[in-house]
Amino acid sequence: MTGKGQGFGFGLGKMKELADAFKKAQQVQEGAKRLQEELEQMEILGESGGGLVKVIVSGNQEPKRVEISPDALAEGAEVLSDLVTVAMKEAYNKSTATMRERMEELTSGLELPGF
């Protein structure tokens, strides 16, 4: 049994910490929503063959478009396939790196446990 005045062990300091944690969580949630909107609008370029093939994706890796130079068509199907694959990988890698950087910016300084 607890002594008089001890309650459940939640002093004002603990309540303030809890309130601060909720405030930080709300800030992260709002920031994440803005970040998601920004990532959707981004256009990140991956290219290959000196620009013969360009792949554009959003900041959250959604394909937006593929641009293929007429000169790339003359290279044949196998080479064209390789060029598209390389450009896609480059666009994807740039996009994931951008997303990671933006997420780190969002959560930096928040002192979240486990991050």
UniProtKB/Swiss-Prot annotation:
A Pfam family: YbaB_DNA_bd
Places the protein is found: Cytoplasm, Nucleoid
Keywords: Cytoplasm, DNA-binding
Main location: cytoplasm
Function field: Binds to DNA and alters its conformation. May be involved in regulation of gene expression, nucleoid organization and DNA protection.
Record text on subunit structure and interactions: Homodimer.
Protein name in UniProt: Nucleoid-associated protein Npun_F0448
Species this chain originates from: Nostoc punctiforme (strain ATCC 29133 / PCC 73102)
